């Protein structure tokens, strides 16, 4: 038996906002869409991200603070080198992401927040 991760689902209060952000950032097409759930997948169809509507969505606090909404997961996106890292951060910022105030990864790992407040990272990943 073979099991592989296919899709990560992000809760949100504004699906179109996140679909626009991630399809523009990753150039992945929408592959499934209903009113309360939209999925996008890599062009190789290896991995996907889906956005599920939650009318009570509260953005996570990052880094975590006692008594605040906790992050349940975050996404790491690999880039080839520091130049690609800089370009990815600039592009994500133009698309509506924010660089997180707290950074722990040095020059090769940048934490950002998408337009709905989900943390994600760009990482110079050589393996």
Question: Each predicted region: which residue ranges?
Answer:
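Glyoxalase I/VOC metalloenzyme domain signal
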Residues: 1-6, 10-32, 42-98, 113-127
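Short loop/turn motifs at secondary-structure junctions and domain boundaries
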Residues: 100-104
């Amino acid at each position: 038996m073979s099991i592989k991760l296919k899709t990560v689902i992000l809760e949100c209060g504004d699906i179109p906002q996140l679909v626009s952000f991630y399809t523009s950032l990753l150039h992945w097409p929408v592959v499934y869409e209903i009113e309360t759930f939209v999925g996008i997948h890599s062009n190789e169809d290896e991995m996907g991200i889906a956005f599920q509507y939650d009318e009570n969505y509260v953005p996570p606090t990052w880094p975590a603070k006692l008594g605040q909404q906790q992050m349940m997961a975050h996404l790491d996106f690999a880039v080839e080198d520091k130049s690609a890292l800089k370009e990815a951060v600039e592009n994500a910022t133009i698309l509506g992401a924010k660089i997180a105030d707290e950074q722990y990864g040095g020059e090769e790992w940048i934490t950002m927040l998408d337009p709905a407040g989900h943390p994600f990272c760009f990482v110079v990943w050589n393996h």
